[in-house]
């Protein structure tokens, strides 16, 4: 589903109970609201342009600012306020997934190199 936003547009490409995948086009200077997701990680992959992510950390008073360029990826933890803004016209993908997937591996053995 395609939807307009104040800073561009977003299109949900996949939405189900376990993952969401959105394509966003943000105009240079566009900035989203400061917000948080209670249970979902929020990942950003930049296809084209430049996007600045501000993360308001829960563990300390500083705001982490990361500038992403084409090919870069970063993720914001659940419960952390954040915003993104386009420093240039930007095409990006947002990926959302729940915290419960983080520790979903149970190892029965240890990896090794066979001769």
What are these regions (language model features)?
Residues 1-23, 31-34, 65-66, 70, ...:
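A short, N-terminal "cap"/entry segment at the start of jelly-roll beta-barrel domains
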Residues 39-58:
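Glycine- and acidic-residue-biased ligand/ion/polar-headgroup-sensing regions
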Residues 3-4, 83-115:
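Double-stranded beta-helix
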Residues 29, 48, 89:
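ATP/adenylate-binding site constellation spanning eukaryotic-like Ser/Thr protein kinases
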Residues 57-79:
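Short acidic-glycine-tyrosine-enriched beta hairpin
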Residues 24-44:
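Short, well-structured hydrophobic secondary-structure segments
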Residues 32-34, 44, 53-54, 75-76, ...:
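Short beta-strand His + acidic residue motifs that chelate non-heme Fe in jelly-roll/DSBH
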């Amino acid at each position: 589903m395609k939807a307009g936003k104040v800073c561009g547009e977003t299109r949900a490409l996949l939405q189900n109970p376990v993952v969401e995948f959105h394509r966003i086009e943000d105009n240079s200077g566009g900035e989203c609201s400061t917000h948080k997701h209670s249970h979902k990680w929020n990942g950003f992959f930049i296809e084209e342009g430049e996007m600045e992510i501000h993360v308001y950390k829960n563990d300390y008073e500083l705001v982490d600012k990361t500038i992403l360029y084409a090919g870069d990826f970063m993720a914001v933890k659940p419960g952390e306020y954040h915003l993104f803004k386009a420093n240039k016209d930007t095409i990006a993908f947002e990926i959302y997934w729940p915290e419960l997937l983080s520790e979903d591996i149970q190892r029965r053995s240890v990896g090794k190199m066979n001769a």
